A protein has these predicted regions:
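Peripheral docking tails and interdomain loops at the edges
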Residues: 305-355
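Conserved thiamine diphosphate
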Residues: 116-170
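Thiamine diphosphate
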Residues: 1-128, 135, 143, 331, ...
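Redox- and metal-dependent alpha/beta enzyme cores, enriched for Fe-S-associated oxidoreductases
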Residues: 239-278, 284-290
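Conformationally flexible catalytic loops at phosphate/diphosphate-handling active centers
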Residues: 162-241
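Glycine-rich beta-alpha junction loops
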Residues: 107-109, 169-176, 255-257, 308, ...
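Glycine-/acidic-rich phosphate or pyrophosphate-binding loops and their flanking alpha/beta elements
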Residues: 8-12, 226-249, 262
């Protein structure tokens, strides 16, 4: 029977990862995700796993690379500036087709920024986590329950597609407490015949590597990898719709900002405005199919974010000039209020000819 408990978001992430079969965690303390690492330091040894506080974020991601190469389910976590330091290692994992899970509990930036919640790493997560030609699935929870659900799913995605996967949370979700139904522990994990555990006469000699010195070989592998990305784009788009069936104004928001946007949508409906919420759960692949469905009745889209305007680029690409696209955001760790978003909805409605 599933267990329901009251937990912080960071702790729910950690416990769910353990139940997903994660037995190697390598981290480094940074606000606002330190509780995740602290929880792992207590729980991991009790279940026969390995917790190691690395000497740096760079070391931590390369330890994930090593554990993943040996076929283990491994994870690291950090917050915005720490994720930047992990970028090279994430690229190496992508180039070696290694599964692993990276948690980013975002804070304000750029630079050292602040310790308040932010969503300013959207571009980094979906476009430029590291150098080279690669993508990785990015999941965006909006509740403590989804913090648990997303990391549980992330390990399966990582193994299925042999890719790093990121859970993009934020300091608000990491620090808040809500009831969460924890998933059942996985009883079996997929076999990984490619892992460096000895071939035992069952396969050819194998080296896990991202270095290819001939251009043709590297191009061939990149093309094969992008064919896999197309499968992910087709099969793994996830989103949630709220009051969207007849919406003429579609608010698009993810993570913590979607909670605020939801309240604003309810308030706008009470004033007679036909507005709904589209909440991307996968940021990559972006839920273009849901945008396409909404275009059958939407006259305008409003992207609400805790940054200066990043996801709005993907909204514009998906809409492709067929409706107006507006943006409202707060930055630096400031959380928008429902009243602010309601005002932005009314402005979009006027520009879209709805009011």
């Amino acid at each position: 029977m599933a267990e329901k408990v009251l937990m912080k978001g960071n702790e729910a992430l950690a416990e769910s990862a353990l139940r997903a079969g994660c037995r190697f965690f390598f981290g480094y303390p940074i606000t606002p995700q330190t509780e995740l690492a602290a929880y792992m330091s207590k729980r991991m040894p009790k279940i026969g796993g390995t917790y190691l506080q690395a000497e740096s974020e760079i070391a931590a991601i390369n330890m994930v690379y090593g554990a993943a190469s040996a076929g283990a389910r491994a994870m690291t976590s950090s917050s915005s500036p720490g994720i930047s330091l992990k970028g090279e290692g994430i690229s190496y994992m992508a180039g070696s087709d290694l599964p692993g899970v990276i948690i980013n509990v975002q804070r304000g930036g750029p630079g050292l920024g602040g310790i308040q919640p932010s969503q300013s790493d959207y571009w980094q997560a979906t476009r430029a986590t590291g150098h080279g030609d690669f993508f990785m699935p990015v999941l965006a929870p909006s509740t403590v329950q989804e913090m648990a659900d997303c990391v549980y799913r992330a390990f399966d995605l990582a193994d299925e597609y042999r890719t790093p996967v990121m859970v993009l949370a934020d300091g608000m979700l990491g620090q808040m407490m809500e009831p969460v139904v924890l998933p059942e522990p996985k009883e079996s994990l997929p076999e990984k015949p490619w892992a460096t555990t000895g071939h035992k006469g069952k396969r050819a000699h194998n080296i896990v590597n991202s270095l290819y010195l001939t251009a043709d070989a590297l191009e061939k592998l990149n093309i094969e990898r992008f064919e896999r990305y197309e499968v992910i784009r087709e099969k793994e788009q996830r989103s949630e719709s709220f009051m969207l069936d007849d919406a003429e104004i579609v608010v698009v928001a993810f993570g913590a900002s979607s909670r605020v946007a939801r309240s604003a949508v309810v308030a706008a409906r009470e004033e007679g405005i036909k507005v709904g919420l589209l909440r991307p759960i996968t940021l990559w692949p972006f839920p273009t199919k849901a945008i396409e469905d909404a275009l059958s009745h939407a006259k305008a889209f409003l992207s609400v974010e805790m940054n200066m305007g990043q996801m709005v680029d993907d909204v514009r690409l998906a809409v492709n000039g067929r409706a107006a696209v507006d943006f409202y955001g707060r930055t630096g760790g400031v959380i928008p209020t429902p009243e602010e978003v309601l005002s932005a909805i009314k402005d979009s409605a006027k520009r879209g000819g709805v009011l």
